[in-house]
Amino acid sequence: MSSRPFESPPPYRPDEFKPNHYAPSNDVYGGDMHVRPMLSQPAYSFYPEDEILHFYKWTSPPGVIRILSMLVIVMCIAIFGCVASTLAWDRGYGTGLMGGSIGYPYGSGFGSYGTGYGYGFGYGYGYGGYTDPRAAKGFLLAMVAFCFIAALVIFVTSVIRSDISRTRRYYLTVIILSAFLGVMMFIATIVYIMGVNPTAQASGSLYSSQIYAMCNQFYASTATGLYMDQYLYHYCVVDPQEAIAIVLGFMVIVAFALIIFFAVKTRRKMDRYDKSNILWDKEHIYDEQPPNVEEWVKNVSAGTQDMPPPPSDYVERVDSPMAYSSNGKVNDKRLYPESSYKSTPVPEVVQELPATSPADDFRQPRYSSSGHLEPPSKRAPSKGRTGRPKRLEQDHYETDYTTGGESCDELEEDWIREYPPITSDQQRQLYKRNFDTGLQEYKSLQAELDEINKELSRLDKELDDYREESEEYMAAADEYNRLKQVKGSPDYKNKRNYCKQLKSKLSHIKKMVGDYDRQKT
């Protein structure tokens, strides 16, 4: 979709004018023609209604969070399997260390290198600032369990599309929980590295010399010929499954960091866009024909046929961001009351459409009872019928694409009569002054209209956060209804139409100036 529904008029850039030997000097233009370019930027040029966010897709930020949480679940299971497979070597199974060939002791904390070796060897490493391998593995398994539960909760709540997973508060909780688990998982992985690799923590330790002397035999390139105890071997050497667990631990940390990134991105989009712009479920375009169309054609006579819907109503339905979800309900709130589409139509032969063109002396085409389009006649537009309720503007923002093609052509003819093609530099300078004046008026008027739209969007988000019985909800609802009445007032509509008229005028002046500059060069 287009991200610029209410585009600003083309900017007038005096610096684009390239003077040559035919052009006059800068004195004709007041000496400031090339000093500072005049850029036209609308006050609120981006209209969020024109962009739809498909959050049900797996490539969207919530979808990426689901994928990452699923990967965390798989990696946690793999880490648990790798660490659990090495727990048997920490229980002291096996024979005495190196048999009885080496009988000298390595200190009371390590026990004796003889047949009397027992649990004192393992527990001795827990003292004197030394990390016990079993304690490191237990800490890592505990953090893996917490990460598994958290990732499972995130995945399940997002997959079942619960209401709580579609709020900004939910993603704030995901950010905080992921940050906490990521930090704790980083600490657990570092502790696990120190526990399964004793030489990594031996430097500066009380038992550094004994550990190096005991483990160097496993690092030597040639075998010593002695019988090695399997427990001591697995203690000194990092097993492949332990290395895999370390790598997966860091990958879990990276996954949590990415979850935080996409959760922040999701919250920003939810703050920026209206709820009606976000599709949490796969939409079904409501383009089916009315039910029992064939039966209706057979039974209804030509004289009593209902008139076809006016083009303005059709545009409102097509442009509306509302879509029906797969579970049969509307993705978001209803934009206008039920009475606006259940009112009893007043039968009449010819239906006049309300004028939406910026030109006040033109009217929209009308439809006869047979459904044929009658050519418009140039006369003052008549007021719309009071029996037919008129829908307010689409949600909070309007686009200017509902203007009829005939009125645009006729309005262009009016501007051509008022601003004919430029024939002299003095006339160009006059157009420049008119453009500057109109541009300032357009920006001021557009800023006033956009302020109402942004305030409505802000109140709409606040109403979703408040309880209906609270005083804050009632105050916000009153202000919301007041602004809706302001948008439905004739003064607002006149300003909006005049703003469109100014945009058309500025576009025409810009075109005339551009044509003249191209002819000069």
Curated annotation (Swiss-Prot):
Q: Which residues form the OCEL domain?
A: 413-521
Question: Which residues are annotated as modified residue Phosphothreonine in the UniProt record?
Answer: 304, 402-403
| A Pfam short name | MARVEL
Record's bilayer topology term: Multi-pass membrane protein
Keyword annotations for this protein?
Cell junction, Cell membrane, Coiled coil, Disulfide bond, Membrane, Phosphoprotein, Tight junction, Transmembrane, Transmembrane helix
Q: Which residues carry this modification: Phosphoserine?
A: 301, 312, 320, 339, 368-369, 407, 489
Instruction: Indicate where the modification Phosphotyrosine is found in the sequence.
Output: 367, 397, 401
Q: Where is the composition biased (Basic and acidic residues)?
A: 390-399
Positions with biased composition (Basic residues) = 380-389
Query: Which residues are on the Extracellular side of the membrane?
Result: 90-134, 195-242
Subcellular localization is given as:
Cell membrane; Cell junction, Tight junction
Q: Which InterPro entries match?
A: ELL/occludin (IPR031176), Marvel (IPR008253), Occludin (IPR002958), Occludin_ELL (IPR010844)
Segments on the Cytoplasmic side according to the record's topology features: 1-66, 160-169, 265-521
GO cellular component labels: apical plasma membrane; bicellular tight junction; cell leading edge; cell surface; cell-cell junction; cytoplasmic vesicle
Recorded coiled-coil stretches: 424-488
Q: List the disulfide bonds.
A: 215-236
Instruction: State what this protein does.
Output: May play a role in the formation and regulation of the tight junction (TJ) paracellular permeability barrier. Interacts with ZO-1.
| Domain notes for this protein | The C-terminal is cytoplasmic and is important for interaction with ZO-1. Necessary for the tight junction localization. Involved in the regulation of the permeability barrier function of the tight junction.
Q: Return the protein name.
A: Occludin
| Species assigned in the record | Canis lupus familiaris
